Amino acid sequence: MNVVVLLAPGFEELEMVTIVDVLRRAGISVVLAGIVPPPIEGGHGIKVITDLSIDDVGTYDALVLPGGNPGYINLERDQRVLKLICEAYDGGKYVGAICAAPVSYTHLTLPTILLV
């Protein structure tokens, strides 16, 4: 399985690090894709070097969007993020959104989704 974690300025560092750590410990391939060039600064001043640009996202099985303020707002304002979310749903892929991140795409017309 290949997972892409999308990062925008103001992301919640704890939500990003936790999901990346747990998935990698489980042997799952995880890459960090940024909507801006690295480094990307989280909501609490921690800067992260992403693996690639959102423009270079290739094959993946799941997308993960960490929350954070203003991270979730920056995700919502980026049309490339919204396009990837729609493509993921259309392709039967998983989309995980943590904390405030589901707000990023509640305005999209998507099939019924499960929010936990």
Question: What is each stretch, according to the model?
Answer:
Residues 1-91, 103-104:
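Extended, subdomain-level signal for the structured scaffold at the beginning of enzyme domains
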Residues 13, 112-113:
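Intrinsically disordered, low-complexity regions enriched for glutamine and histidine
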Residues 98-99:
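Short, thiol/selenol-centered motifs that function as redox-active sites or metal-ligating centers
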Residues 106-112:
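Conserved small/polar residues in nucleotide/adenosyl-binding loops
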